Amino acid sequence: MSRAEALASVLEGTESLAIVCHDNPDPDCLASALALKTIAADAGVDNVTIAYGGEISHQQNRAFVNMLDIGLESITAVTTDEYDCLAFVDHTVPGANSVLSATVTPDIVVDHHPGNARNATFADVRTEYGATATIFVEYLRDLEIELTSRLASALLFALHRERLDFVREPTRREYEAALSVYSDADLEVLEQLYGSAFSPGTIDAIGRAIASRTRRGSSLVASAGDTAETDALPQAADYLLNLEGVDTVLVYGIVGDAIRMSARSIDPRIHIGETLVDGFDEFGAVGGHHDMAGGRIELGLFADDAGDRDQLLEFVGGRLTRRFFSALNLENER
């Protein structure tokens, strides 16, 4: 039995399915959720809900949801216990990158990030893949499910945004997956998605990151400040990675009640996910891939060390900067 058939067998006989995205979901997560919903419908599941935590603040992600008409529910409005089956897409560990309790056990897990899918009835975690959408393209092909233009467009955009648009080790599988969905995708929709406008908040956060950057050798750290735009952090990190002579970037900021971090590296000697774990694992949830990673640290850990949020940001920024450069063995670099 193939993995696609094993997934379908879990869904057969299921009446209701809750698909939970990670917090602040990106196109890879959203397209994967849409693909799983399609597979579930093909298996006869009548009631399917796609839920997410956090917010969708990246301008392309908002346009992605609206233009492709992806129905989403806030996880706070969904009681997962009321569903026969619970699925995680593009994340593995409950509580690590979602508001769900760490005690929750998903029935289905499909992901390309490192993680232990404990006790799941069906788990397919392929860290050698560059995108979760790639896995779902293979499922759809193996199950001979016909692609709609909407689903093909979602998967193609996800593959590009997750890997193919960047020098981030896209695997041969991402190119093959993109080729297989290309003919069914609406290229005009993709063109409009790429033209999505930045929000003023995102521009402000990226501007603060550019102005605040601190560099050691080919690595730098920057602050996006106190922002409501979670997705501004990875966008700022991507932008700063274009600076001449820079190959590793960490951008941090205060978002709501937490410090968020986004890191990028194109240095083959650096595993940026492991670097964040080395520097910040004792403070919060961090991790990621060889070339891209992120993390979240609760503000409560530092609340007693500073007064207002500006002072807190300055205090936290100093500590994060020192620990990041230390994890890269750049304490004495200039």
Region spans (language model):
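Gly/His-enriched, cation/cofactor- and phosphate-binding structural elements
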Residues: 5, 12-17, 22, 30, ...
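Divalent metal-coordination and catalytic microenvironments
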Residues: 26, 36, 65, 111, ...
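Hydrophobic/aromatic beta-strand patches that form the interior of the parallel beta-sheet core
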Residues: 51, 87, 106-110, 123-125, ...
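Phosphate-handling active-site elements
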Residues: 41-50, 143-149, 301-307
